[in-house]
Amino acid sequence: MEKPPSIEETPSSEPMEEEEDDDLELFGGYDSFRSYNSSVGSESSSYLEESSEAENEDREAGELPTSPLHLLSPGTPRSLDGSGSEPAVCEMCGIVGTREAFFSKTKRFCSVSCSRSYSSNSKKASILARLQGKPPTKKAKVLHKAAWSAKIGAFLHSQGTGQLADGTPTGQDALVLGFDWGKFLKDHSYKAAPVSCFKHVPLYDQWEDVMKGMKVEVLNSDAVLPSRVYWIASVIQTAGYRVLLRYEGFENDASHDFWCNLGTVDVHPIGWCAINSKILVPPRTIHAKFTDWKGYLMKRLVGSRTLPVDFHIKMVESMKYPFRQGMRLEVVDKSQVSRTRMAVVDTVIGGRLRLLYEDGDSDDDFWCHMWSPLIHPVGWSRRVGHGIKMSERRSDMAHHPTFRKIYCDAVPYLFKKVRAVYTEGGWFEEGMKLEAIDPLNLGNICVATVCKVLLDGYLMVCVDGGPSTDGSDWFCYHASSHAIFPATFCQKNDIELTPPKGYEAQTFNWENYLEKTKSKAAPSRLFNMDCPNHGFKVGMKLEAVDLMEPRLICVATVKRVVHRLLSIHFDGWDSEYDQWVDCESPDIYPVGWCELTGYQLQPPVAAEPATPLKAKEATKKKKKQFGKKRKRIPPTKTRPLRQGSKKPLLEDDPQGARKISSEPVRGDIIAVRVKEEHLDVPSPNKASSPELPVSVENIKQETDD
């Protein structure tokens, strides 16, 4: 039996040049990662390499789909509903689409550029194989075809730096203006919701492996050496993706504790430094505290736990999303929620999609998560009977932002599937009454009516007493949605019900209302009222989308828990802007998610100096599509306005006035407060946290010069 290489050995197949690269770039393709896995006795690298070669051969023979189709469930049909078109995957860029929309007779590529790039790379691979004396294969493999050649560090740190077209900073630009979650949590003794509560975020089903007392190797920031050195730290506290760490040797001294996001590449399992020839150096502050650091670490590490060896690999795997720029879909029309519009995916960040309406302007966009019930595949509206705004033919489409971005339609199985419904034994009928979350004011649960029954279990619901009489405020809910409830739900759960116009909340009675309107309530058995053990508790902190301005993600608190329904309060804002969301909503995220994905996080609102603004300028502010403008709570601290502020929101009159006159008196000055913007899906199978491989040979004693 062949002896596995020890941590000091370097496999002979690896060229020496590999060691001269930046060792902090943990994953630089499977070749550079082979020595890491083999050194710890893991066969995952060789398995990945062998399986990758086997998959390539099978793909060439037409037996396996390209990687994006691995996201499909085993029972996924091979044809699209209603159209009969088969799904296809571009062999160059990996984009998923339909065969009829793909290029060439073979339908192997999504565009001419991909076809040419594939051909060029195939020739290079064939020439390289001949130079190396390898036998020719039936089809030369494409060089650098997949995104796996990207470094894991670059992937986690900079998923597109700079700004989006709407001015939203991303990547490193977002992190520079980031909100300090650690200080905020520690100063106020807040508790963050665990990552395991959010089923749509990376590694949600493996976060139980991250526990208090766990040991990791992190960058030593308290050292004066020319090269980057590391030291071992213990997890003192967990808060979402962030952990509070303490260097070994400080023991009970918390003065040098620091927060870190476990998604960064400077946090590693124990043994990583020994494998990668990195030096362990104690912090300069305590370097003289012990004379035998090796013995001290041996005692501290024995029996402890650390991160799984493949932690960062699985993190990257779980942050790959099937939606790509250029995919077309149907999304709710934000100007008229009773219909949908055609849109094109412009940006994908952490599973969140920035959509551009096809017939809109360059800033006519809409943000949502890829699991949002607001988006659907092309043809969905026609199939279920939902209204859709037909795109107008524009003569200047060459200058439209979606021009040259439309590659293919997003296939149906990329969208979150809804629960199957059975209409036998009675179903929803037009005119039935129920309670529903108001889509235009998400903090209210209102008396509502089923206005129309669509196909596939979808319903058009309207709020009783709404301002619209033409049906423009109808909203589409699926029968299994957790945003609709049977009559008396609010009464049974002590939630304030918003009655129709002309009724008082204190005196509203369902029996009298049904009798007066000569209607009947929808049977309770038709509603989806199951409640999982979600783990959310009152007071937990998280990051939540402001659904009235869905491009913004804000610091928020779980204000109330009613079964699976959560009342989300945005820190610093008045309670009238609270929102009801489901515990499995894709619009809530754990602490540190924005930092992990490079998305901008809105901090709690603080007082800012009033900015004089001419009345006529104030009236030009873009009107919000949904809901009311936010009224600010008088804060105790002040903070200067940061450069990242965009789209200021007008503050309401603190005495209760909600509207600003469109024709202000000459000479009046309107004070404007600006809402600050600060930058800061299923996962692989769960792996148990391994015992520590105690290896502390490379410990260097640092001395003061």
Curated annotation (Swiss-Prot):
Compositional bias annotation for Acidic residues: 15-25, 50-60
Pfam families assigned to the protein according to its UniProt record, in alphabetical order: MBT, zf-FCS_1
Chief place of localization: nucleus
Subunit structure: Part of the E2F6.com-1 complex in G0 phase composed of E2F6, MGA, MAX, TFDP1, CBX3, BAT8, EUHMTASE1, RING1, RNF2, MBLR, BAT8 and YAF2.
Chain intervals for the UniProt region annotation (Disordered): 1-84, 608-705
One Gene Ontology term from the biological process aspect of the record: negative regulation of DNA-templated transcription
Keywords for the protein's UniProt record, in alphabetical order: Chromatin regulator, Isopeptide bond, Metal-binding, Nucleus, Phosphoprotein, Repeat, Transcription, Transcription regulation, Ubl conjugation, Zinc, Zinc-finger
InterPro entries with a match to the protein in the record: Mbt, MBT_L3MBTL2_rpt1, MBT_L3MBTL2_rpt2, PcG_chromatin_remod_factors, Znf_FCS, Znf_FCS_sf
FCS-type zinc-finger residues: 81-116
Role: Putative Polycomb group (PcG) protein. PcG proteins maintain the transcriptionally repressive state of genes, probably via a modification of chromatin, rendering it heritably changed in its expressibility. Its association with a chromatin-remodeling complex suggests that it may contribute to prevent expression of genes that trigger the cell into mitosis. Binds to monomethylated and dimethylated 'Lys-20' on histone H4. Binds histone H3 peptides that are monomethylated or dimethylated on 'Lys-4', 'Lys-9' or 'Lys-27'.
Residue(s) of cross-link: Glycyl lysine isopeptide (Lys-Gly) (interchain with G-Cter in SUMO2): K405, K647, K659, K675, K700
Renumbered ranges of MBT repeats: 179-283, 291-391, 397-500, 508-604
Phosphoserine carried by residues: S13, S67, S338, S683, S688, S689
Skewed-composition ranges (Low complexity): 38-49
Protein name, per record: Lethal(3)malignant brain tumor-like protein 2
Molecular functions per Gene Ontology: chromatin binding; histone H4K20me2 reader activity; methylated histone binding; zinc ion binding
PROSITE patterns per UniProt: MBT, ZF_FCS
Positions of post-translational Phosphothreonine modification: T76
Positions bearing the Glycyl lysine isopeptide (Lys-Gly) (interchain with G-Cter in SUMO1) cross-link: K700
Keyword Transcription on entry: yes
Highest taxon, organism lineage: Eukaryota
Compartments where found: Nucleus
Record-listed Zn(2+) binding positions: C90, C93, C110, C114
Annotated organism of origin: Pongo abelii (Sumatran orangutan)
